[in-house]
Structures are given as structure tokens and as C-alpha cells.
């Protein structure tokens, strides 16, 4: 009989190490630890070791590292030919780090596929806003004039981007945000976007299943590369979303 296993209970010290990601449970897949806090130090430590928080209102903080891991190659986001035709005719523009709080608010109001409510609690929103103010969390925003119609946010360490959530205020807004993020990162030599857990929508956009061991190897390599934190706004500027049709996206 297989011994019953429980996730590790984290202490209150933000500097306390996580257990190895390989120690995560298989049922539920990837649950590694419970407790702790969402301080910037603990969050950055988690991501740098292939671990992320995911829990609902009323639950303790749950930390995960599933196997396999969903990722996007930054040159592998798929936009359909039909969508590209629509995009060529659009007047949407794309920016970075100019509306982070609006993006995370909109993501919190948009449940993940298969879920009735949001997993982005008020506590989580404040934690990622704090990371953004420190230059570690970033958003890509899609605008129709002055109106936000799509976005994605996540955490950057070294040359690894850990996607957290995205939303569409209008059809296709999240696709444009993801494609813009991927194109920008690919141009800067960043190979992967962490997409965390599998769902059909991500697969339709080109996400791949990566064995956890391979994912952790990539994380270890990429987070060790020097990439100073800070706002992406000036570096990214503002671009016409239609220009994504001319990138190397498949």
C-alpha cells in the first residue's frame, strides 16, 4: 500500500526554503506545500524553483509544481489565419506596464475555464501589485483607443517569464496580449513562457506539455541570467497590434 502523503506545511519565515518541486504530490497533481505568505521574497523564491501559488478564497495558500508543466515557446504561439486577417484590420495598440492594476483587476473578474469563481483573491492582487512596483511583475496591455480590451500579467526572473493570468474584454484581446508578449520575449532571447496548468484554450494557442524535470532545468538556466528588474513601459513603447501579423508567430 502506498503511504499517505501530505503537502509540506510552510513556516512563517519568508526566507524558509521550499521542499524540492519533485516532492509534489501526484494527487492532486503538483500540490507541494501549504501555508506561508505572499511576500515578495517568498514569491520570487517560489518562481525561481518552478513553484507557484494557486488557491481560492477561504483556503490556505497552496503551492504547486505540476508534472507535466504547460509552457509556450516564445516563437510558438499560434494565431489562426482568420484571426490574423481580423487583426490586420484592427486599430488596437499594445503597451507594457502602463495599466498593471487594471489588468490584474480584469483577470480577477474573469474565472479560469472550468471554474465558477476567481482564484485571484484580493490578497493575491496586492501581492503581485507589490512585485510590479519592485519591477518583477509585468503586464502586456491591449487597447482600443483608451479602452483596455485585453491583457496578460506575470513574473519575470532572469530570462524566464512566468505567466499568471490573461483576460479578454473583447474577443481575441488575450490572444493579442499573449502573442505580443511572446514576440517581445523572443526578440530579447527569452525562450519560454510558463503557462502552469493544462487547459484546451492554451493548447489551441500552441502551449506544450513539458516534463517537470525538463521545465525545472530550463528554469534553473534562465533565472540565472542577468536581467535587471524594472518597468518595461519605456523599453516596449506602443505598437500597432496589426504588426503581430508580420512576426514569426506560427
Curated annotation (Swiss-Prot):
Region of interest (Disordered), residue spans: 1-21
At the top of the EC hierarchy, this enzyme's class is transferase
What is catalysed by this protein? N-terminal L-lysyl-[protein] + L-leucyl-tRNA(Leu) = N-terminal L-leucyl-L-lysyl-[protein] + tRNA(Leu) + H(+); N-terminal L-arginyl-[protein] + L-leucyl-tRNA(Leu) = N-terminal L-leucyl-L-arginyl-[protein] + tRNA(Leu) + H(+); L-phenylalanyl-tRNA(Phe) + an N-terminal L-alpha-aminoacyl-[protein] = an N-terminal L-phenylalanyl-L-alpha-aminoacyl-[protein] + tRNA(Phe)
In the UniProt record, which is one GO cellular component term?
cytoplasm
The protein's gene is named aat
Q: Which GO terms describe its molecular function?
A: leucyl-tRNA--protein transferase activity
Output this protein's name: Leucyl/phenylalanyl-tRNA--protein transferase
Which InterPro entries does the record cross-reference, listed alphabetically? Acyl_CoA_acyltransferase (IPR016181), Leu/Phe-tRNA_Trfase (IPR004616), Leu/Phe-tRNA_Trfase_C (IPR042203), Leu/Phe-tRNA_Trfase_N (IPR042221)
Q: Which UniProt keywords apply?
A: Acyltransferase, Cytoplasm, Transferase
**Record-stated family:** Belongs to the L/F-transferase family.
| E.C. code | 2.3.2.6
Q: Which domain of life is it from?
A: Bacteria
Described purpose of this protein according to its UniProt entry: Functions in the N-end rule pathway of protein degradation where it conjugates Leu, Phe and, less efficiently, Met from aminoacyl-tRNAs to the N-termini of proteins containing an N-terminal arginine or lysine.
GO biological process, alphabetically ordered: protein catabolic process
**Protein's cellular compartments:** Cytoplasm
Q: Which organism is it from?
A: Xanthomonas euvesicatoria pv. vesicatoria (strain 85-10) (Xanthomonas campestris pv. vesicatoria)
| Listed Gene3D superfamilies | Leucyl/phenylalanyl-tRNA-protein transferase, C-terminal domain, Leucyl/phenylalanyl-tRNA-protein transferase, N-terminal domain
